[in-house]
Amino acid sequence: MVWSVDMDDFSGTICGSGVKYPLIGAIREELRGTPRDTVAPGIEPSDIDWETVARSPPALAPEPDVQAERISIQDLLQQTKGASKKPLPALLTPSLPDNLRKPRVFCYFTNWSYKRPGMGQFSPEDIDSNLCTHIVFAFGTIKDNKLAASDDNDVGDAFNDGTYGRIMKHKEVNPDVKVLLAVGGWAFGSKPFRALTENVFRMNGFVYEAIEFLRLHNFDGLDIDWEYPRGADDRASFVSLIKELRLAFEGEHKSSKNPKLLLTAAVPASFEAIASGYDVPELAKYLDYINVMTYDFHGQWEDTVGHNSPLFPLNSASTFQKKLTVDYAAKEWVRQGAPMEKLIIGMPVYGRTFTLADQTKFDIGAAADGGGQAGKYTGEEGFLSYYEICDFLHEDNTTLVWDNEQQVPFAYRGEQWVGFDDERSLRTKVSWVKTEGFGGIMVWSVDLDDFRGYCGTGKYPLLKALTKELEGYMVELKYEGPYETPRGDGSDPVEEKKLCDNDIGQVTFHRDTQDCKMYYVCQGTVEHHKTCPTGLVFNENENVCDWPSAVEECGHLVAT
């Protein structure tokens, strides 16, 4: 509707264009596909009565132009004023192709983190679920060949939610976040998995009991952390376990109509461990995601100083040492047959420490005399959380070094030495992830980031640096496996809930719960994935692109 025609240049003499009704004519030109300059020879545009043209039947509409147009924030805000307050789809970006998806951000946190003293104590409520696509609780356990909680407090009772219930409340904040339970881990070891898989009946019982346990506690999937299968028997057993879990998850999904449970695995970065225990092409068939633990390349178990998670090797490194890097490890999984879009690259938010044998020799490869002093809150020799590293860096006489070859920092003071990741190194790693085309990142573990803002740069500085660097990145989907879907999320495309289901052609708007800057426009049953202009987020209440401060769920994007 136009308010009002008497305010347009109805005579064609005021604005100097010689055209009657230039604004109404522009509206009709955009809506009905009749250009104003398409006139018969010898007829001037000023001779056309655009009021009559505007009332004429519409021309056949051409195919819509999906080319995005750049508009300024001021233009957008001006356009959104008025009665409808709905953004104009023609001004926005085209829909997301089916062969692309957003990167995954797996956020692990541990069940021993809440036992840390003082400001190190971490609770499920401390998680910022808007920074994660998947939350992984580590760890569950195996008791009597069944998946079980590792702590009675995890399950809760009639009087309290327990840890599981408290984690699930994040789905109320971010309905699209997936919550998985991890089982295994370094302390759990390999023996329980061997005992489970050496008997087919025992393994199948575990598989079906696991489904019941996950559904009972509202988990969205299971993360298998077998550290580590070694040898031909373990190699075959691990594939059997993953295959049986996947087949059971698929069958339960089809019979119950519930969303399919996700199946992931945490796997080593060591090329030796990969060769010894992992049939990569077979595992890739059944796993939704493969979380590569690209850290702990060096630590207190060695007698020389080395960095926890170097991206690249030193030029002077030996052939063996050059394989102990993030770059080599991730590409080794690809060489062995893992699809790049399924590989999730580990990002540590902690450091490994050493005690120098000689304070004057502090570079990579210097002699070490065991691990560094235990942290005040984590209490483990040879290990510091990022918020403990902040304390270390602020002590007098501490020297911070950026290793330009390995693309990571380290610091030393006296005989104490720490190699860690900071915002700069993590941004560099994510840039590398994007260049190579991997499927996303996983963080070990969010309870080790500065979740309280103790370091003075806000809460979760490392996790925020990671997610900020991922913005705009899309993962290309190339793998064609037996259980793949166009979106690569492991769900059944036939029974997947459809966002756009209005068969009368109504236009509706919906926020993208995983990305504040994006939203969906439904034209009947046709879905278009759109992006707001730079600096704005989608406001579902008003159906406009708005300032982040006006949208509660997106307040964390407000510039500081």
Where do the language-model regions lie?
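Glycan-recognition patch characteristic of GH18 chitinases/ENGases
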Residues: V2-E30, L76, K85-L214, E244, ...
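Substrate-binding surface in catalytic domains of secreted glycosidases
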Residues: W3-F10, I14, V19-Y21, I27, ...
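An active-site-proximal structural segment forming one wall of the substrate-binding cleft
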Residues: V200-L222, A275-L283
